[in-house]
Amino acid sequence: MIKAVIFDVFETLITHYRAPLYFGTQMAADAGVPASEWLPLWRATERDRSTGVKSLEDVLAELLRTSDRFDPALLAHMAQKRTATVKACFDHLHPDILPLLAALRARGLKLGIISNCFSEEAAVLRQSIFAPQFDAMCLSYELGVMKPDPAIYRHCMKMLDVAPDECLFIGDGGSRELEAARKLGMTAVQAVWYLRPGVTPSQPREDFPQAQTPMDILNDLNP
């Protein structure tokens, strides 16, 4: 019997790709550094940014210094811009996300989040409209472990006091999250409502059941 529903965040609860993007390419432009030089340096820091080793500000300072472009005002501008674009994702929620969460809670289900996220994303999530609606928010930046490591799933299950076969995991499929959830014994469903061919990194796949809309999740619960 399903007792808890655990969600990925990006491209599941919210999407980057309907708000202005501020990824490595846009940062390189603001820094005045060729993208061909900036992007390898930026991408090489992803694990450290995801597991709390380094904050956004730490990494920006390092990269600006490496590129001989360090300026405190520029760093502050870039960090603020990155945070603002994360906040802007909440302006483009699928209209059924909040009704889905309300419907799940009305059924007495526990709700959890497992997200690979950076310092600025974790800060926004903690202050977001989602924060009071979830019983467990397991954020990689805070925990020092990221999907698909089973440890972050186990941590969430411990917080929710549920077993794997009592969990429904919902995600777009990035970071091999669906495979990890299934391997642990969870029911895994791919969220495809934000996925767009040629735009989003993840695409619909045939090896997992799909939810075309958030409300489809209700069909994957106990009869």
Give, region by region, the residue ranges found by the protein language model.
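Asp-based, Mg2+/Mn2+-dependent phosphohydrolase catalytic module
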Residues: 1-5, 33, 76, 98, ...
